[in-house]
Design a protein with these regions (language model features):
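Conserved short loop/turn motifs at secondary-structure junctions
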Residues: 36-41, 155-164, 184, 352-353, ...
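The substrate-binding groove and active-site-proximal loops of carbohydrate-active enzymes
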Residues: 2-13, 33-45, 155-156
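Aromatic/acidic polysaccharide-binding cleft in carbohydrate-active enzymes
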Residues: 41-43, 69-165, 425-465
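C-terminal domain-boundary segment and adjacent tail
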Residues: 26-99, 167, 171, 487-492, ...
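C-terminal (or distal) subdomains of carbohydrate-active enzymes
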Residues: 2-20, 58-60, 70, 81, ...
Length: 558
């Protein structure tokens, strides 16, 4: 157990308190006490080091030994073979608000993560030597993921600096990515999910940009010329708030929420109460304003008025968009609900002028799915979480972290929520709630104030999240199509996900990093022999067969 805060001056009383707080003495092992002025405070001092050298000579003190963190862990595991282990999520019952605070920062971080992947890949395929430039961009990017920056718990000048850095990084990556005559699929599986392709002459609008909705149908790691086909607009009907499409018959309320979502393909209803319902709560967690959300945040709900009832604002042969304008006393919220001719997804775009104080905005989805678990996407896999609230531990997990998607399924069918930069989500019985915006005042009184534009997609599906390929759909939702004239000569490595293709840090070798993201095992027979590497890109063997296990990360050299 480390000290309880980020500053420890190595006083004898702190050492004693640390030892007394260590409750597993009967299991053996040691406890670590890290000392120094933390949180940007410059670390340990000479006085602290001198105290450390004297502790071992005092009989009234616990036995102390000075060593580094790696040495401590190695020695502790070697000397104590029977140490108890924890399997599963270590859930911190605080700082839940950091999943949501500073929405624009988190959204831009997500976009840049995918742009780094694209820039590295295209540099390798073009034979360009951009590694040193990309490395410097990575360093600046990772500094802004540091404690208090990406979580949003920082003062306003930090936010301004971070967004300026992100703009600089994005411009440099865009220059590396460049352009071409054809659209290149950077994903190592067929790109078959509906996508928005910018086009100044397009008939649709998204994020304020004109373009077209189309199904690319581009094979893995291949290029293709895309042209929007023209279709008649008679693929849907809309009357008195009810829309019928090839996939759904949905009844919507004036505020954009659903009173019914009937699945024409699966012959079932999906809703059971408020579905796609925007709710704004009073959010006043006290001392740790930007950090925390309290369990009682639902006690007071803020009234939302409908300024413009839901109505069709745009439609073509692929997409129909319904628009409603909502407001509070201080903020304006435009919600655009999109249905598609060729996709089961229902996209919701939110254009928000946000000027609140101590507020939490959520989109809530009460479904009729019977389940006690939900799946949440992570950076290279997913984690399973309980949705019922029988115990105090379950009740404490009212807000959890996820990445690109979350899912609730029963046998045969379920619903996923796919996002482009939202990380906080709650589960309560059969209800999912996606956290959208916060309005904290400490340590930044202007936190999240201003303009926001973000989307999420509701994705009902047959089967479960794995069999419905939700992860592939979410990857396509987050990885924009790019124009590039390149050719791929390596295997596609399906069904593993191509996490990265990059130049080696220490040689001219090309490094391929793969991850298994569906919890399965198997093997891939390659048409060549490749080097098997560890995560540090050190060679550990050669192979022509990749044997993989659930959620394994594999690094190869070619």
């Amino acid at each position: 157990v480390p000290p309880t805060h980020f500053i420890t001056w190595n006083a004898p009383s702190q050492i004693q308190e640390n030892w007394e707080a260590y409750i597993d003495k009967d299991q053996g092992g040691q406890t670590m006490n890290m000392f120094g002025y933390g949180d940007g405070g410059s670390g340990c001092t000479e006085e602290m080091i001198e105290l450390m050298h004297r502790f071992d000579k005092l009989s009234v003190m616990p036995k102390c030994e000075h060593m580094g963190g790696a040495e401590f862990l190695e020695k502790n595991l070697k000397d104590n073979k029977n140490l108890q282990t924890w399997d599963g999520e270590l859930y911190l019952e605080m700082h839940r608000g950091t999943f949501t605070t500073k929405s624009n920062l988190k959204q831009k971080n997500r976009q840049l993560e995918f742009k780094f992947r694209t820039a590295e890949m295209l540099s390798v395929l073009r034979g360009e030597d951009n590694q040193s430039q990309i490395t410097e961009l990575y360093k600046k990017f990772l500094v802004n993921q540091f404690h208090d920056i990406l979580p949003g718990s920082h003062i306003h000048p930090v936010y301004e600096d971070a967004m300026a850095d992100y703009t600089e990084i994005e411009n440099a990556l865009d220059e590396i990515i460049g352009t071409g005559s054809k659209f290149f699929n950077t994903l190592n599986f067929e790109r078959n999910a509906l996508a928005f392709v910018p086009n100044k002459n397009g008939s649709a609008t998204r994020h304020g940009v004109k373009g077209n909705w189309l199904v690319p149908s581009i094979p893995a790691l291949s290029s293709k010329t895309l042209r929007a086909a023209k279709h008649s607009n008679d693929w849907f009907t809309y009357e008195n708030g009810t829309i019928t499409t090839p996939f759904y018959t949905a009844s919507l309320n004036s505020d954009g929420s659903f009173s019914s979502l009937y699945d024409n393909e699966l012959c079932r209803e999906w809703t059971d109460g408020d579905f796609n319902k925007l709710k704004i709560y009073t959010d006043n967690p006290g001392n740790y304003d930007a950090w925390d959300i309290l369990p009682n945040y639902k006690d007071k709900q803020i009234e939302i008025k409908v300024d413009e009832p839901l109505a069709i604002c745009e439609h073509d042969g692929e997409c129909v968009t319904l628009k409603t304008v909502l407001s509070t006393e201080k903020s304006k919220w435009t919600m655009l609900v999109r249905f598609f001719r060729q996709s089961r997804g229902i996209e919701v775009e939110n254009q928000v002028s946000w000027h609140e104080k101590h507020r939490l905005a959520k989109a809530e989805f009460a479904s009729n799915i019977l389940t006690r678990k939900a799946l949440c996407d992570t950076s290279a896999g997913f984690i399973e979480r309980e949705t019922n609230k029988n115990t105090t531990w379950q009740q404490a997990r009212f807000e959890t972290c996820h990445h690109k998607w979350c899912d609730m399924s029963e046998t045969g069918a379920g619903i996923s929520l796919i996002n482009e930069g939202k990380y906080g989500v709650g589960f309560d019985e059969n209800t999912m709630s996606l956290s959208l915006l916060r309005a904290t005042i400490r340590p930044d009184v202007t936190s999240d104030m201003g303009e926001h534009d973000f989307c999420y997609m509701i994705m009902p599906h047959s089967g479960d999240a794995v069999s419905a390929d939700i992860n592939k759909i979410a990857l396509q939702y987050n990885a924009p199509l790019v124009k590039a004239d390149v050719e791929w000569s390596l295997p596609t490595f399906e069904p593993l996900y191509l996490q990265a293709v990059k130049k080696s840090e220490d040689s001219d070798m090309t490094v391929v990093r793969l991850s298994e993201q569906n919890g399965t095992r198997g093997e891939i027979k390659l048409d060549r022999t490749v080097k098997l590497l560890n995560m540090l890109e050190e060679e550990i063997g050669e192979t022509d067969t990749i044997k993989y296990s659930p959620f394994e990360i594999i690094t190869l050299g070619v």
